[in-house]
């Protein structure tokens, strides 16, 4: 895609469509905009089908690998030259937690025989296996629960996914996996959150523990 040079200005009245080749904004925006224009111009394309397909395309590579314990093996990481030196494996928890928090409400919908229903069912089944691997110390995809302060943030996204789809994503887990999650969430209290939005991450985890009937820290919720 075209990347706008620093200092270059947009042309007044410039219009973007699927055939645009003129300079417009930065490359990432141009590519995204053109893709969306193609979608808008496609005949008889439903919004829901389009967005569900995108959600599936984003989720499948993560969950299909993690369900087999192969996410960390197959997901290559690249870091900035200014990387702060923290353990790079935080990226795997970030990937899984934020993905699941995002698609959890979608996965709460009941199964059906539509194309969307089949996608949801497939992702949910892979997600349940991925959840188990995430807290199994013997799994290659055991996440970085015991190191780095960042795990409080991304652990909260995992907890949020359970809150958003409690019956579909938490209840089906086996008792060993549930016990492991409760232990991992509780040990995150070792991290003292700064007085920022990190307070919300702590409260999300404690709120989930309360819902699951486990011991929770009321102070961190209030």
Give names to the regions the model predicted.
Residues 92, 103-106, 120-222:
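Aromatic-lined, polymer-binding surfaces characteristic
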Residues 23-34, 97, 101, 156, ...:
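A structural signal for well-ordered alpha-helical segments within the folded catalytic domains
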Residues 5-8, 95, 147:
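Generic structural "secondary-structure junction" signal
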Residues 13-20, 83-93, 145-149, 193:
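Short, solvent-exposed segments of well-ordered alpha helices
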Residues 43-129:
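Extreme N-terminal leader/anchor segments
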Residues 38-41, 108, 211:
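Generic secondary-structure signature for well-ordered alpha-helical cores
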Residues 1-43, 64-84:
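CBM-like carbohydrate-recognition segments
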Residues 41, 63-74, 111, 139, ...:
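Residue-level signal for secondary-structure boundary elements
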């Amino acid at each position: 895609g075209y990347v706008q040079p620093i200092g270059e200005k947009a042309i007044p009245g410039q219009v973007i469509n699927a055939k645009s080749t003129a300079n417009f904004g930065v490359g990432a925006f141009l590519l995204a905009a053109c893709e969306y224009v193609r979608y808008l111009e496609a005949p008889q394309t439903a919004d829901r089908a389009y967005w569900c397909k995108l959600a599936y395309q984003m989720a499948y590579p993560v969950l299909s690998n993690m369900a087999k314990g192969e996410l960390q093996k197959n997901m290559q990481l690249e870091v900035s030259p200014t990387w702060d030196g923290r353990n790079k494996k935080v990226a795997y928890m970030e990937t899984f937690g934020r993905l699941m928090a995002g698609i959890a409400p979608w996965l709460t919908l009941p199964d059906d025989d539509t194309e969307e229903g089949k996608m949801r069912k497939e992702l949910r089944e892979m997600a349940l296996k991925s959840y188990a691997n995430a807290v199994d110390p013997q799994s290659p995809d055991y996440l970085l629960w015991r190191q780095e302060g960042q795990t409080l943030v991304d652990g909260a996204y995992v907890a949020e996914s359970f809150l958003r789809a409690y019956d579909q994503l938490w209840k089906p887990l086996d008792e060993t996996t549930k016990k492991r999650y409760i232990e991992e969430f509780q040990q995150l209290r070792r991290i003292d959150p700064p007085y920022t939005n990190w307070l919300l991450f702590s409260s999300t985890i404690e709120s989930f523990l309360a819902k699951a009937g486990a011991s929770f820290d009321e102070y961190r919720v209030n």
